[in-house]
Regions:
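Alpha/propeptide regions of enzymes that mature by internal proteolysis
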Residues: 1-305
Length: 305
């Protein structure tokens, strides 16, 4: 199989928004064409998606439920053992680049203030304002939360609550819950690649998934959950992170591939693992295949030399 790259824009992004994924894939493919390795290709692709502004990553990241907090996660991994991740990172436009630089350290994961200081020391600290889309999405989420506050006050929590009542119950932002409500007025991007030398790599990045508590970290920076790469291929996941974590989904798919399951079948089997109604999407690449699978159509691209 020729050098190949696959990108996606998250389960919330319909195919009509795939142009950003195509641009990202082209940039990554250029790296592969220049004989740079798969890791450089996927980082380049994801950095493009982070800079786009439409996707829930980088400058397009969704605000926390207090209306001002931006906590970003990202990770990279390749089949030669390089691994780096960041979680709850603030004031950085390209967390995927910070994750890549962590592969040069003895560590694999930095979080919060430590991750931000690391970004500052390597010249990647770059504060930014929430995008227009992020501000609009925040208003939409707050409207939903306010409805839960008005309609469910005093009612017992239910499984159908979708987390809104529980988020209010355990609210832990410095701003009060009511102040956030009064201010009212899912997605991860990713790339997987195979280079001409047969090496695989994956990169993922997200701005989080409201409604969520301050400090929430889900699948994106957790190895084997939102991403995995090894000698047999690379996998990236997107969707409701807690469900992905509970199934260690990326590593689970990778194990199926090792056992001989074709890539497309493995991706579709992963989707079937999660309950109906749970948004989920995956991309993957092996020595012979490159595929996208999702519960509902999502923005993505596949390019090869």
């Amino acid at each position: 199989m020729a050098a190949t790259i696959v990108t996606h824009g998250g389960t919330d992004m319909p195919p009509e928004e795939k142009d950003g994924c195509e641009t990202a894939a082209r940039l990554g493919l250029q790296k592969l064409g220049d004989r740079q390795d798969a890791l450089e290709a996927v980082v380049t692709a994801v950095a493009s998606l982070e800079a786009d502004g439409r996707y829930d990553a980088g400058v397009g990241s969704l605000m926390g439920m207090d209306g001002k907090t931006l906590e970003l996660d990202a990770a990279v991994m390749d089949s030669r053992g390089r691994l780096g991740a960041v979680a709850a990172l603030q004031n950085v436009r390209h967390p995927v680049k910070v994750a890549q630089r962590i592969t040069d350290t003895p560590h694999v994961l930095l979080v919060g203030q430590g991750a931000e200081e690391f970004a500052r020391r390597i010249g990647l600290h770059s504060p930014f304002e929430p995008s227009v889309k992020a501000q609009r999405k925040f208003r939409e989420y707050i409207a939903e939360m306010k409805k839960a506050h008005d309609d469910d006050e005093g009612a017992e929590d239910t499984e159908e609550d979708d987390g809104k009542t529980l988020v209010r119950k355990f609210w832990n932002f410095p701003t009060s819950w009511q102040a956030a409500v009064d201010r009212a007025g899912h997605g991860t991007v990713g790339a997987v690649a195979r280079d001409e030398a047969g090496h695989f790599a994956v990169a993922v990045s997200t701005g989080g998934s409201p409604p969520a508590l301050y400090g929430r970290v889900a699948d994106t920076p957790l190895i084997g959950c939102g991403f995995y790469a090894g000698q047999h291929g690379a996998i990236a996941c997107t969707g409701i992170g807690e469900h992905i974590v509970r199934n260690m989904l990326a590593r689970t798919v990778y194990e199926w591939i090792i056992s001989g399951t074709p890539l497309q079948a493995a991706l579709e089997r992963a989707i079937a693992l999660l309950p109906q109604g749970i948004d989920i999407g995956l991309i993957g690449v092996t020595a012979t295949e490159a595929h996208v699978a999702a519960r509902k159509p999502m923005a993505s691209a596949i390019l090869a030399l």
